[in-house]
Amino acid sequence: MADVYHALGLHMHQPLGNLAALHNSGESWEARQILWCYDRPVRMLEGYEDIARLHMSLSGTLLKQLEDPAVRQTFSDIVNIEGFLDRYRRSNIEFVGSGLYHPVYPLSPPADWDAQTEWWLGLGRHLLGRERFEGFWPPEMGFCMEMIPMLKRHGYRYVLVDSL
């Protein structure tokens, strides 16, 4: 029988300030459900390190909120954000990079691409405990061939796209 390979990818995004806005709007139940969704993937993989792999993209705007001490304190009764980030650091997840403020690269000025990419890499290294990110998840799957030289400069080896 032929070998079978399967890649599972998951992208998580949260507009900047949205978790706090939901919490303050009376829709705190929604923020609670969202935060639990961020905690679940790594729990699902625990105990299956020998066979389970996940490619995961966390948007820069989500990472910025997860880093924010005020967000961590506000939601500490729901989930331990530092705890699940620590489990992410130790897990069998391959994180893929992105742009910090979820830019649609082909619609953004090319002069901004490097900064968006570098900012995400700095935050990703800090919060996710990885030095390198081999894959890149373009926000909104916005990709154009002109991005390739920039992505190579930042050490990326592959890009997840839905079509070319």
What label would you give each PLM region?
Residues 1-134, 141-164:
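Catalytic alpha-helical scaffold of carbohydrate-active enzymes acting on polysaccharides/glycoconjugates
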